[in-house]
């Protein structure tokens, strides 16, 4: 009969179902942008407010060159808009570590592509992000226009020493 062709597809959809159980999604409106990698989303269902740390990326700190530009750029992309936040964990500060989707675009990746954030390569090995940072660096986009930009991680460490 014909039903043999259906089986692999069915198994595949089961696999995707089980995978998606490990991740959750918040759908809501962006009501705040704190900096280039932290936002606040109001959940559509119960209007609960979630602080979201954009996963896989590290934007310049506010005191750094490009810190404000990164914040403004992120705002221009998503502030006041409906987004979907996919996440698997919450950090020790109670922030949701998520990937933001808006109008079909993966916003975390867009930030890296345009030179408004570094790829957080220490924690994340996603090939698209590695490639995006290489390309932005090569094209001297955003923060890469500076010949020696300081990684936000290093910057935070140097601030703590003082």
Predicted regions located by residue number:
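Small beta-barrel nucleic-acid-binding modules, primarily SNase/OB-fold domains
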Residues: 2, 7-162
């Amino acid at each position: 009969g014909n039903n043999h062709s259906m089986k692999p597809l069915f198994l595949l959809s089961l696999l995707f179902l089980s995978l998606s159980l490990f991740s959750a999604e918040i759908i809501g409106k962006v009501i705040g942008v704190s900096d280039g990698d932290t936002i606040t989303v109001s959940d559509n269902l119960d209007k609960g407010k979630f602080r979201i740390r954009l996963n896989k990326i590290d934007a310049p700190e506010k005191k750094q060159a490009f810190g404000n530009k990164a914040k403004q750029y992120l705002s221009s992309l998503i502030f006041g808009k409906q987004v979907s936040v996919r996440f698997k964990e919450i950090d020790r500060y109670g922030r949701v570590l998520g990937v933001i989707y808006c109008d079909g675009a993966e916003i975390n990746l867009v930030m890296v592509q345009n030179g408004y954030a570094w790829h957080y390569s220490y924690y994340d090995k996603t090939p698209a992000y590695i490639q995006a940072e290489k390309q932005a660096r090569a094209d001297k986009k955003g923060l890469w226009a500076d010949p020696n930009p300081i990684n936000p991680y290093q910057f935070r460490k140097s601030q703590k020493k003082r």
